[in-house]
Curated annotation (Swiss-Prot):
GO terms for molecular function: large ribosomal subunit rRNA binding; structural constituent of ribosome. Residues 137-160 are annotated as: Disordered. This is Large ribosomal subunit protein uL11. PROSITE patterns: RIBOSOMAL_L11. It comes from Methanobrevibacter smithii (strain ATCC 35061 / DSM 861 / OCM 144 / PS).
Amino acid sequence: MAKDTVEILIEGGSATPGPPLGPALGPFGINMMQVVEEINNKSADFAGMKVPVKVSIDRDTKEFEIEIGTPPTTSLIMEELGIEKASHEPGADIVADLPIDKALKIARMKFDSLLANDYKAGVKEVMGTCVSMGLSVDGKDPREAQKDVDAGKYDDVLVE
């Protein structure tokens, strides 16, 4: 029972049998419409966002399993803030401000795939992403906000 795994990045809820899915899965001879339908059903909550998808295929029986990952942190942040692009000059150009409660929401969504042991550390990881995107957090530089998290200034919001 040999299994192959294909990993692809697809827009949530709108997979099609065309590229990138079709060329990646076509050689395995599985029913593409079943795969597309299952991916779209499982990724519907992430509509409009790029979502990592892992398709495991049994070469002998042509059965497949689909795992939907969470979108990249940058995609979740942009979705929360309603922005289309991050800053071209992250150190100099601030394009938006991420409130601490939204940072916590994103950390909760991504928690299983973060390196953090608790939500406080998860929020700090999200803030780290904000640095490279040219965003502020609660009206300040994300690095300052991280220090505030360490100092306990957001403990009332960051309740687990």
